[in-house]
Structures are given as structure tokens and as C-alpha cells.
Design a protein with these regions (language model features):
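Exposed, interaction-prone extracellular/peripheral surfaces
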Residues: 2-51, 56, 60-69, 75, ...
Length: 312
């Protein structure tokens, strides 16, 4: 029996979204239970681009996640607060989001959320931090049929339009996903070194994809965000029909309790995951693996910490 890891969903109604998507993201960021992690994420984002030039322009207040080596202790003592040297090469940077909006992203994640909604949360979180720090954000999004791009901008209004593209373009009626098509566009259009954030689901590592990851990680700071697939063998009774969004193959309910199916699925899943992990680790790519909304901030924090440490 061959068990794949294609995108799985269940037949449940999806309510349309009204209002600002960015406002929803910010509301999640500043919930009392997540505020500390959000401030840490903000600090690590601020540090990720920072170099070590010989001169510094001015001082600013310390943010959790800043490097201790950047603290100006004398100035801090005079000001009665912890101050950080702002190095001369701290300038406006660019963050390019490469987001899969194909049919696969309209499926459910490991935690039950729609993958496209997690993609909105990830892009909105990092995009909001970037705009807060005066950086520019851009978007390359699409599927196997169409790839669209939004130019670099540094406003919340522009970020809101990007989030709306991600949300509205991904549905069960969309063409199938093609991360390779998005990465081809990125390689053709990104001329200057940028922070590139790829948001996709768990895809198989082809020779083409491997070559793209090697090329992009050599030219850019690369962060790979993997939205975790639902486990078709773990779907419970009463959730509705379980089917593969690519081929619309429906899983018979009797197979969900098949021990052989579970074992083969777990083996193939582990093999795919290990191949991808080895490549990304070898190329120095930071990885965030997110299965639900609540995982977004801690996993992004972990990825930016790894990115920051890798540059030292």
C-alpha cells in the first residue's frame, strides 16, 4: 500500500473573513499570554540584519533579543536605562514573502486550522515587525497556474493587501500548488540580498526544489516556514469526509484504524522530513514548522534565533 502525504481536508463549511486581516494578526500577537514571546520575537527580528561595522550612528533602548555585546554600559549608566549601539550599517532592509496559495493551502493543518490562515498569521506577524522597523515587505504568491508579485513597500496598508491576496487566492477551487514555480520567480526577480521567507506546506524534495534552495540560500537570508499537514490516519469520526485536495480521493473510514496504513504513513513521513531537514540544515536555512496558530510566534522566534546565531 502506498501512502502519500498530500494535502488533506474535511468537508466542513468555511466562513468568509471580514475586516482587517492585519488587525487580527496584531490582536493575536498582543494577547496577554503571548506578549513576552512577541517582544522577544521583535528583538530577534531587529538583530537579524545587524552587522558589526566599526562606527555606530546613535543609541536606542534595549529590546529583549538584542545582543549583549551591543550594550553601551557607560551610556546606560548615565541614562538609567539599558541602551544599545545602533550600528552604522543598520539601514532599511527588504523582506520577501514567498507564499503558496494553491489548493493544498486550503486544506487543514495538523492542528485543524486551515493552512492558508496559518500562512496569513506567519506573513502578518513577520511583515508587521518588518514595517515597524522601517523595512520593506514584498510578496510572491501563487500556484501551478498563476504567480503574482507585489512590489516592496513599507506600509501597513500594503501589508494588508498582501495578506488579503494570500487569504482570497487559496481555495479548494484553486489550481494545485507549485512551490517550485514561486521559487523560480524569486530567483529571476530578486536582484539584491534580502530576507526571504518561504511559506508552504510539507512538500516532497525534488531535484528541482533542491537546486532552488541551494541557489536562494547562497544569495539571500532564507527562512523556511513549513505548515504541517493533517494526519489522515488520525482524523476522527464525525469530522466529515476526509479527502485529498489534489486528486479528491476520499479515504474510506475503515482505513483510519488500519495499523499497517498508520505504520507506512509514519515511515514515509519520517523519510521525507529527514531528507528536507538535512538539506536545510546543510544550507544554513532556518526552519519553522507550524501546525496551528498558537505555534506561530514560538516557532518563528526559534527560527530567528537560529538565523541570528548562524551569522555570528
Amino acid at each position: 500500500m502506498r501512502v502519500g502525504t498530500d494535502a488533506i481536508t474535511v468537508t466542513q463549511p468555511v466562513s468568509p473573513v471580514t475586516g482587517s486581516l492585519l488587525t487580527r494578526v496584531k490582536s493575536r500577537l498582543y494577547l496577554r499570554s503571548r506578549r513576552k514571546a512577541t517582544h522577544l520575537l521583535d528583538g530577534h527580528y531587529a538583530s537579524i540584519h545587524r552587522g558589526r561595522s566599526l562606527d555606530f550612528d546613535d543609541l536606542r533602548e534595549y529590546v529583549p533579543g538584542d545582543a549583549v555585546a551591543d550594550i553601551d554600559w557607560k551610556a546606560s549608566a548615565r541614562a538609567q536605562t539599558t541602551l544599545i549601539r545602533r550600528w552604522a550599517d543598520e539601514r532599511r532592509h527588504r523582506v520577501m514573502f514567498i507564499v503558496d496559495t494553491g489548493r493544498n493551502m486550503a486544506a487543514h493543518s495538523l492542528g485543524g486550522d486551515l493552512k492558508r490562515d496559518i500562512a496569513v498569521t506567519v506573513t502578518g506577524t513577520l511583515g508587521y515587525l518588518a514595517v515597524r522597523h522601517g523595512d520593506e515587505v514584498g510578496l510572491i504568491a501563487g500556484d501551478s497556474s498563476t504567480v503574482r508579485a507585489r512590489p516592496f513597500r513599507s506600509s501597513e496598508a500594503a501589508l494588508e493587501r498582501m495578506l488579503r491576496d494570500i487569504h482570497d487566492d487559496s481555495s479548494l477551487q484553486s489550481p494545485v500548488s507549485s512551490t517550485e514555480a514561486l521559487l523560480d520567480r524569486a530567483r529571476a526577480t530578486l536582484r539584491h540580498r534580502s530576507l526571504v521567507v518561504v511559506v508552504t506546506d510539507e512538500i516532497d524534495l525534488s531535484e528541482r526544489l533542491e537546486a532552488q534552495i541551494v541557489a536562494l540560500s547562497a544569495q539571500h537570508e532564507l527562512v523556511w516556514v513549513e505548515v504541517l499537514d493533517a494526519d489522515p490516519t488520525a482524523m476522527v469520526q464525525g469530522q466529515g469526509r476526509v479527502f485529498d485536495v489534489d486528486g479528491e480521493w476520499q479515504m474510506p473510514s475503515m482505513l483510519r484504524d488500519n495499523s499497517r496504513l498508520r505504520r507506512e504513513f509514519a515511515e514515509q513521513y519520517a523519510t521525507r522530513r529527514e531528507r528536507m531537514r538535512e538539506l536545510l540544515e546543510h544550507r544554513g536555512v532556518s526552519v519553522a514548522r507550524i501546525g496551528r496558530h498558537e505555534d506561530a510566534v514560538p516557532q518563528l522566534l526559534r527560527a530567528l534565533k537560529a538565523r541570528q546565531h548562524a551569522r555570528r
